[in-house]
Amino acid sequence: MSRARSGKVNKNRHKKILKLAKGYRGRAKNCFRIAIQKVEKALQYSYRDRRNRKRQFRALWIQRINAAVRQYDMTYSQFINGLKQANITVDRKVMANLAVHNADSFVHLVELTKKSLAKTA
C-alpha cells in the first residue's frame, strides 16, 4: 500500500494563509509559521471590532442627536423621554441623519416632544 501524502492539501492551506497575510510587514507576509499566528490574531481583532463598531456608531448617533437637541434648549434624555411619551418610534440612526441632513423635519420632532413633555408637566 502506498503512503498517503498531503502535498496538495498542505500547499493549498499554506497558500490560503499567505494570501490572508498579504500586506503584512517583515516575515509575517511570507513565512507560514509566523503568518498563521498573525492572521489568527488579525481575525480575532476583526471579530472583536465588528461588535465594537456597533457600539461606536450608536455613541456617535447619540452625540449628534444631543448636539442638535441642545440648540433647542433640551437635553438628550429629555428628548428621548418626550419621544417615548409622544409614542414616536424613530431609531437613533435615523434621528442623527435627520439632525445632520434634514434640519426642518428634526425641528418638527423636537416640537412634538416639547408638546408631549408640556402635557405631562
Swiss-Prot record:
GO molecular function terms attached to this record: rRNA binding; structural constituent of ribosome
Gene: rplT
UniProt keyword list: Ribonucleoprotein, Ribosomal protein, RNA-binding, rRNA-binding
Record-linked SUPFAM superfamilies: Ribosomal protein L20
One Gene Ontology CC term in the entry: ribonucleoprotein complex
Protein's organism: Orientia tsutsugamushi (strain Boryong)
Superkingdom: Bacteria
Family matches, as InterPro entries: Ribosomal_bL20, RIBOSOMAL_L20_CS, Ribosomal_protein_bL20_C
Name the record gives this protein: Large ribosomal subunit protein bL20
NCBIfam families assigned to the protein according to its UniProt record, in alphabetical order: rplT_bact
Function: Binds directly to 23S ribosomal RNA and is necessary for the in vitro assembly process of the 50S ribosomal subunit. It is not involved in the protein synthesizing functions of that subunit.
Protein family: Belongs to the bacterial ribosomal protein bL20 family.
Disulfide bridges in this chain: none
GO terms for biological process, alphabetical: ribosomal large subunit assembly; translation
